[in-house]
């Protein structure tokens, strides 16, 4: 609700954070119960909640054997993935892509698109390729890091076979393939992970944002074969894997695993595709509930966003001026989608 008491339909979800929506009662109870029992303890003690999260995650993970490291954000998760790749391979070059966003810390900003200010130096070399290119991957490359769908760039889908070609190139040259699933993971595409949506399994992947539905948590997954090459103590975190974050993430996984939950996400994504031709929308890109609506020439996404706000609907922007971004709670209702479609059809933009 707004400060004046007015209500809004949130179709942006805080950049894919509000997996279960605002003020989810079940999640609130889980967090309150955990706070009252144990809000924090040292990492020197075993914490059964971490094992419980692993058990909850395991059925939905990509094929293979995985280990996971807990931190507090997507940037941290990506930093840890890069550190693991550099150590496991002994190489010093990371391949990244134009349009990418991986975070604002030193290493993460180094592999983010050049339009975002970076730190003056980083402990590795970056080879930046055009989106969709597999040129430049050779025996000097430690890892290729990418978002399976580039969200901030404008919900840009990968070209056909691009991810499979990257997988083949990495295998050919002994480089690791890393997926940044900070936004595409946790059921967002109607599959638990983007690797399942695109049928390409990476050597490591990261997630955050919606992993604990608004409670700070970053996760770095790495295959057992890579993990066995890493020195003990390579990664560490004071708050990572704390009891509150673990409790929230377990609740998220419980909800995602419910029968028909992911099918519901897929169905809503298809329903939102009906926005094409409604008012200023000329195309819809993306998958599941990570979508970009392309706005017709002569109008901007910002104008449409502001006009929708007058209808009580919150949407988002991105780095593409003609793309309106949607990343709502996965608990969205079909009636909510109909409310958006009606509003688009009846918009007055730029008047």
Model-derived regions: residue spans:
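Conserved N-terminal phosphate-binding loop of PLP-dependent enzymes in the Aspartate aminotransferase
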Residues: 1-351
